[in-house]
Structure formats: C-alpha cells, structure tokens
C-alpha cells in the first residue's frame, strides 16, 4: 500500500486531489490518502444543499461548503478531524462493503487504545454507541474509492447549529440533537496518545496501519505530486469543487414531491416536474449510495409519461438498484405513485 498526505487545508482542494488521484494514480497496490481541513461542510452527491444545511450559520461563520462525488449524508469537518480515503481497483472492493474497507482503520485504533471502536449502521464507525466516522464510496473506470472521517477532537457544539436533521431520522425516542449522537476519538485512546495534535494523530495512525515505529520506515511508500499533477488538480478545484453550480445545483420548479426513508437504503426524496402528463424534469435527493450516477437515470426518465405502467416498464429495463443501493423497483414505484 502507498500513501499520500495532503498539504492543503481546503476541503475543495483535497477533494479535487482525491478525485484526480482516483482517475490517474497507479493503483497496482492500494493507495491511502490522508487529509485535514479548515471548518467545512461536505454534502453528498445526491443531497439538496438548501434542505441539509443552515446556510445562514455557514455564511456567518465563514465555513466552506462543497459537494463530493460520492453519496451519503452531510458531514462537518474542522481541524480536529482527519479524513482518509482508500483507492483500489474495483474488483478489490465490493461496493457498499464498509465493514471490510474500514477494518484496517479499526485495527489501528484498537492498537492505540480505542479497543471498542467498531463498524455499525450502513456506513459508520462507533465508540460507546456514538458515531465518530461516516463513510462513502464512489466507483468509475474500474476503480473505487472509499473515504471517511475520523473525528479526533472536532468542535461538536457546531453540529446542532449547522446540520439539519430530517424528520425521517427522528423517532419518538430519538433526539433532535446531532451532537448527542456523535463523539470524538481522543478520550478513548491510551493516555499517551491523548495529547497529540491532529497531525500527530494522523502520523501515528499511519504508523499503526503499517506497523512501523516511524514514518521514515515507510518513506518509500509516500506518493509525491508532480508540477503537472498540481496544475490539473487546481483546474478541477476551479471547475468543480469551488463552483457554485456544482455545489448548489440547478433547482427547477417541481409540481410533485415524494419522500421516504427505507432501512438499509436511507432517505430518498424525489421531485418531479410534469407537463401534460410527461416528465419534464426529475431529481432524486437523499443520503443514499449508488454505484452509478443518479443523474444518468434522471436524464433517461425525461420524456417518459408519468403513468404507473410506463414507469414500471422503464424500471424493468433500468436497474434502479445500481443508482440507489438496495432500492427495489417496487419501492420506487410505491414512492412515485402511492
């Protein structure tokens, strides 16, 4: 396994670097990326920024907003968080196998004293029943990356102000507080590691992953960027991750809205614009995952009569599960027409 530590503290630059390396790096052996960023919110590929984030709070506090190319929900990072990403050949990682992908991280944390760290839910890691890591995957061109957060000593007080909790995620016994359901890793580590900075925590975790005493022992495993790499990453930053059209998207006027939450799928929110019974625009939002880009399905549905039987025939030819993981044809029909 090779690794690359990102120097930038801008999440938009780090995501641009991640996507660039996924597309262009030599991955004959897996590649591990590590990055830390200034306060920011990253929404999932399929989410609606206006519904997920307190945008006023974000603006007032100078917090960066961007969108990633993978699915899943919104996350808040600051300098107390360390993000990681494994880039592999597609046949080396089963899409949605978060337990398998995160095992090396969990084993490293166990060696540092957080012995109760474990995988749970669809895509999360937990300590003492509280989430400290959310993960997401993306696949294209025979390659897959799985990336996640590691909340080392994040300012948890910000979460309630910034992230919106949907009604579908709130049960009668649940709490509206995001903060009460998450935790930081630092208090669970052996005492000798609890005074580390985020950068020192990153370096020690890397040593534990390789089971070496210091980074000098794995210096030959470190991937360095060329001048050309940096120029192409900057272009991706400008064209995509710092581009408001990518971040906020285009939101046309919709006349039909449906919303559901399904176990092991997540929230699926569909908005449909029709004219004379024909679909003129359709958009699926949510914290779901998918192996294929949802916009490909949306484009294919434009011009389709918004009639149960017509949509049923369409879905027989287009596997909805490829776009929304574990979402069945019948579940889609029920959402659209019930």
Segments predicted by a language model, with ranges:
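N-terminal lobe of the biotin/lipoate ligase/transferase fold
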Residues: 1-96
């Amino acid at each position: 396994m090779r690794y690359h530590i990102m120097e930038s503290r801008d999440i938009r630059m780090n995501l641009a670097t991640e996507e660039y390396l996924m597309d262009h790096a030599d991955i004959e052996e897996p590649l591990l990326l590590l990055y830390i960023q200034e306060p920011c919110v990253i929404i999932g590929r399929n989410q609606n920024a206006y519904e997920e984030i307190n945008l006023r709070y974000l603006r007032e506090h100078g917090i960066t907003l961007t969108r990633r190319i993978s699915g899943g929900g919104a996350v808040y990072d600051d300098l107390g968080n360390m993000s990681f990403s494994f880039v592999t050949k597609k046949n080396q990682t089963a899409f949605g196998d978060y337990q398998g992908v995160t095992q090396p991280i969990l084993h490293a944390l166990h060696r540092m004293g957080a012995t109760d760290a474990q995988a749970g839910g669809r895509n999360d890691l937990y300590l003492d029943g509280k989430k400290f890591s959310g993960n997401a995957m993306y696949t294209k061109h025979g390659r897959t990356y799985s990336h996640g957060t590691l909340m080392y000593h994040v300012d948890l007080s910000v979460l309630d102000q910034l992230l919106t909790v949907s009604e579908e995620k709130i049960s009668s016994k649940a709490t509206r507080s995001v903060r009460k359901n998450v935790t930081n890793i630092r208090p669970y580590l052996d005492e000798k590691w609890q005074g580390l900075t985020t950068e020192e925590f990153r370096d020690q975790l890397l040593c534990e992953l390789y089971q070496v005493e210091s980074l000098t022992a794995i210096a030959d495993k470190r991937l360095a960027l060329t001048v050309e790499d940096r120029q192409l990453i900057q272009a991706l930053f400008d064209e995509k991750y710092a581009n408001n059209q990518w971040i906020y998207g285009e939101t046309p006027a919709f006349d039909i809205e449906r919303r559901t939450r399904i176990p092991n799928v997540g929230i699926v929110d569909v908005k449909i614009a029709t004219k004379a019974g024909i679909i003129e625009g359709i958009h699926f939002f949510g914290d779901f995952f998918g192996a294929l880009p949802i916009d490909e399905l949306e484009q294919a549905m434009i011009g389709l009569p918004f009639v149960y039987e017509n949509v049923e025939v369409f879905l027989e030819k287009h596997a909805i599960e490829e776009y929304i993981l574990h979402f069945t044809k019948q579940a889609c029909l029920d959402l659209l027409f019930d």
